[in-house]
Amino acid sequence: MAEEEPLFPALQEEDDFFRINSDRCSEELQDVKQVLFQEEGDSGSDYGSFKRLGKVLPRTVRAGNMLFPDLFQTNNLLFYERFETYKDYMLGDCKPSEVKEFIAEYLEKALEPSGWKAIWHTDVFDVLVEVTDVEFSSLNAIVRLCEPFLCESRVSSITHESINDLLEVKDQRVPLQELRVVFDESGLYDQTALTIEHVRFFYQQIWRPWDEEEEDYFDYFVRCVEPRLRLHYDILEDRIPSGLVAEYRSLLLQSEAVYMQFTNLRNNLSNKDSDSEAELDNVSMVEGMKMDDEMENLKRKLKLIKNPLLRYLFCYQRNSGSYNMQAKGPRPTGGKVIHVVSTSMSITMLQCLTRERLQPECSNKDLEIQFHRDPLEAVNACYEGDLVIICPGLYTIYGLINIMDSIEIEGYGLPDDVIIEKKGKGDSFVDCNGAHVKISNVKFVQHEAVEGIITIHSGTTELDNCVLQCETTGVTVKKCAELLMKYSDLYGAKGAGMEIYPGSKCTLIGNGIHHCRDGILIKDFIDVVYEIPKIIMENNVIHNNEGYAVVLVKPSPNFEKNSHTEELEGEHLDNNMIEEQASSNVLQPNLNEAMGVEDNAIEKSDHLEEEKSDPTIAKEEVECEYAIDCEEAEGNQVIATELVANTRRKTQLHKKRLSTLGIVTADDNNLTSQEIFVSIVGNQFKRNGKGSFGTFLF
């Protein structure tokens, strides 16, 4: 028993050991909880910097004078970082009149008042200073020049004495927005650098001089800060057309100029003696009212661009290119010009180009040839009837190729050798508006785009032997436009490879459409009752799409009933359409091949029965051969049948609506006068996720 007694002290030591470790774990757990689950009273301790979670600001080396110290890199913050800071720490639910007060409180809690160095950055010079104090209410810092004196001037007259004199005039006060905090490895001034960046960004990108005069009953962050912040990052990430961005910046400059004039006029009126200058005041009042109306109009336009939905509805179409440009027509001096595009031209290339393309085109020896380095520049220089020849190479463009005149764009070589790559997410790639446009032997490549690759707004466009590497939507054929697409390859669209609108005409021959969300999307809206897409599809291969090879978008029967109360027999229309289509005068697709295959299969089956062979084996052979031969023909038949039935349905709906207005039309079966033509033959539909054809009802 005596030998066992020492075990108890050992156990006591182990208890102390576990108790100490347990206390240490509790302290660490408490620290984690304090970071992850802060109380409301502690919620302002980090002010959006995430410093306590281990985030540190990187340093950046200034370009230019290498004597300057490194700075904190704060200009590459993400959207959510700025969003959270403005919402949770800086502005909260303040009103427009309370913005400066809230920012001053934020600075007082988050900013180190002294002891840090910064570069005072202006348009004229950069100079190293030390901050001795901060006036939070006026957003100014009290500074002094550092020793040794470091200055980088953009003019030759800046000296140590001139900077000292300037500081004396300004009472040593410098706006916080003009300070860039010098990098410090200790981490003490990370929060200071980040705070100044948030204030600087707010006054440069978010705040407007007229915000204080807005109604004071709404949440400033919700009404102004959030949409402006989102718009800034949409512009930064190229999600908005460049034309709309230019318009937005122009509107901002106009608004600031008009507001400054209006403010000056208002101040002058308030300082005048109303008795001695009454007549002048009346003129100024009228001028002020005009400025006020102009300012309100500019603010309305800015709000349209700021709101994502209104921006899409009212602004995108005006900046798509077709609304901003007009066709040039024939060249004033007459004649045709050949535009040759090449980044570099060797003698061999020039000889081959001259022999194979230029000489056959140049029946007139005086025909002008212009050379360009950019396809966009060449297209913009074109007049009616010009030819653009693009030599092999990779061409990167940053704007919209807007084709307004009847021109021809031809790649000299194979499509994989003539590549046009689009940079910028917001702009469309190619817009076709010319009466007759032809593009051949060119590969178009999109990266991270939000618009389609080619849009035909009007006229006739021919795509021959082209490759289209899409990002969102592929080719869009708008109302009253016509597309002839031959022997081309289209792939990669996250939406539909092709969108065909009502009233358009689309001819597809020998193309490949693959690896898209859907192959072809045919839009048949009830609003455009009598204008249906006219489609010819022959010998295309539509394969490996995520959804359907072909999708028809049409209104549901319930929608049709609600849109026209007198259509009580609407539910019988779809059933009668297919039954009546055989007796109509509409040109039907060539379905005899499918019926012939079926007849052959039946004959072979009968022949096998007569020979009294194994009935199981005979049945399997017949079904297998029939399935292989009819796979493509069945898909063509289903699509054509549905389109023809939909044509008759819309025709009867249109006539029924006209009859309610007392308008008498031709006989229902006389559809040939409408020139309806649907030909869908010889197409192959393979490995599409949902099948060859689908219908989407809305």
From Swiss-Prot:
InterPro entries in UniProt: Beta_helix, Pectin_lyas_fold, Pectin_lyase_fold/virulence, SHCBP1-like
* GO annotation, cellular component aspect: cytoplasm; midbody; spindle
User: Which biological process terms from the Gene Ontology are attached to this UniProt entry?
Assistant: fibroblast growth factor receptor signaling pathway; regulation of neural precursor cell proliferation
Signal peptide residue numbers? none
Pfam families of this UniProt entry? Beta_helix, SHCBP_N
Q: Where in the cell is it found?
A: Midbody; Cytoplasm, Cytoskeleton, Spindle
Covalent S-S links between cysteines: none
PbH1 repeat boundaries? 480-502, 503-524, 532-554
Keyword tags: Cytoplasm, Cytoskeleton, Repeat
Function as written in the Swiss-Prot or TrEMBL entry: May play a role in signaling pathways governing cellular proliferation.
Q: Which PANTHER family match?
A: SHC SH2 DOMAIN-BINDING PROTEIN 1, SHC SH2-DOMAIN BINDING PROTEIN 1-RELATED
Please report the name of this protein according to its UniProt entry: SHC SH2 domain-binding protein 1 homolog B
Organism from which the protein derives? Xenopus laevis (African clawed frog)
> Taxonomic lineage per UniProt?
Eukaryota, Metazoa, Chordata, Craniata, Vertebrata
